[in-house]
């Protein structure tokens, strides 16, 4: 896995609801845990752009609802700073559902995604129409 190119603020704690922007049938998902998070006692795990999270599907088609799976955060409202000094923020928090080995479950991604997520996850970068 490639190193992330900016210092992304981890602004999505456990329990945060995100918009699902692929065509898997899920519309809204909730973060259950963050993969690879090493924290302090009693501190909620938090995720940012490019992080793999375990999610529960809250809204969507009947066969997708209540399913527990993995996803990657591709947009966040909280601004973060890139190495060149540019500050990036999006109008919503969004994720894309993937398998454990990083393969997209859907075939298309709606809306823009962050460059950091596209660099870390090549499958997401190739399926995205707009990379910011």
Curated annotation (Swiss-Prot):
Kindly give the SUPFAM superfamilies that the UniProt entry links to this protein.
Answer: Ribosomal protein L14
Which Gene3D superfamilies does UniProt cross-reference here? Ribosomal protein L14
Under what name is this protein listed?
A: Large ribosomal subunit protein uL14
- What is one Pfam family matched by this protein? Ribosomal_L14
Q: Which organism is it from?
A: Methanosphaera stadtmanae (strain ATCC 43021 / DSM 3091 / JCM 11832 / MCB-3)
Its organism's taxonomic lineage begins at: Archaea, Methanobacteriati, Methanobacteriota, Methanomada group, Methanobacteria
Q: Kinase: is it a keyword of this entry?
A: no
Q: Which SMART domains match?
A: Ribosomal_L14
Q: Which family does it belong to?
A: Belongs to the universal ribosomal protein uL14 family.
- GO cellular-component term (any): cytosolic large ribosomal subunit
Gene label: rpl14
- What is the protein's quaternary organization? Part of the 50S ribosomal subunit. Forms a cluster with proteins L3 and L24e, part of which may contact the 16S rRNA in 2 intersubunit bridges.
């Amino acid at each position: 896995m490639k190193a992330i190119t900016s210092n992304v603020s981890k602004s999505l704690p456990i329990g945060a609801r995100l918009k699902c922007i692929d065509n898997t049938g899920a519309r809204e998902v909730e973060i259950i845990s963050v993969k690879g998070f090493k924290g302090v006692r009693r501190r909620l795990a938090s995720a940012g752009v490019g992080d793999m999270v375990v999610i529960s599907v809250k809204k969507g088609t009947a066969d997708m609802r209540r399913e527990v799976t993995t996803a990657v955060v591709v947009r966040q409202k909280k601004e973060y700073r890139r190495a060149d000094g540019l500050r990036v923020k999006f109008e919503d928090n969004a994720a894309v559902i993937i398998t454990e080995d990083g393969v997209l479950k859907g075939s298309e991604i709606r809306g823009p995604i962050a460059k950091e997520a596209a660099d870390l996850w090549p499958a997401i970068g190739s399926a995205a129409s707009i990379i910011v």
